Amino acid sequence: MPIDKIITQINETAQLERASFEEMKRKEIDQKFEVKKWQIEADFQKEKASKLEEIERSYRQLRNKQKMQVKQEILNAKQEVLQRLFTEATLQLENEPKEEQLALMKQMIQTLPINGTARLIPGEKSADILTPAVIAEWNEELPFELIREDFTEKAQAGLIIDDAGIQYNFLFSHLIKEIQETMSAEIAKELFD
């Protein structure tokens, strides 16, 4: 029976080797599974962090864009208020009593460095008050002579003095615009701070 014993021993050895091989393969599979699982988890965490960063970046961009829009809207509203203020100032100047308008115009032209004669171009809205009598009265007091033109500056109040091509613009809208250009920032600071 030694053959039976050898066969049994071979079977037992084969069974042990198979069990050992199966155990080794199972551990190898488990190890590969764990490595793959860890890799998938790491990739997932990396992807999650990347997506989260992308969402945060998009949120920051959107928030900054909204802040800029709000600032722009506030700036536009302030500019609109300032523009309305200067438009109202022009209208108020145009609606001053006739005597005050004439006094203002006379005061402005008295400072001009003109010799000889100059042309007076009235604004359409002031043409009725810049009568020949008013101009004659001014000519008596001025060191130069004004000659009134027949045409007017359309839809304007005030006047322009033309001294041989050099024009002195005293239209009320122009005067207010000069104030707007030089004092806009200062007025805005007073109004909005």
UniProtKB/Swiss-Prot annotation:
GO terms for cellular component: proton-transporting two-sector ATPase complex, catalytic domain. Belongs to the V-ATPase E subunit family. This is V-type sodium ATPase subunit E. It comes from the Bacteria. One of its GO terms (molecular function) is ATP binding. The N-terminus is blocked. GO terms for biological process: proton motive force-driven plasma membrane ATP synthesis; sodium ion transport. Involved in ATP-driven sodium extrusion. InterPro entries: ATPase_V1_Esu (IPR002842). It comes from Enterococcus hirae (strain ATCC 9790 / DSM 20160 / JCM 8729 / LMG 6399 / NBRC 3181 / NCIMB 6459 / NCDO 1258 / NCTC 12367 / WDCM 00089 / R). Keywords: Ion transport, Sodium, Sodium transport, Transport.
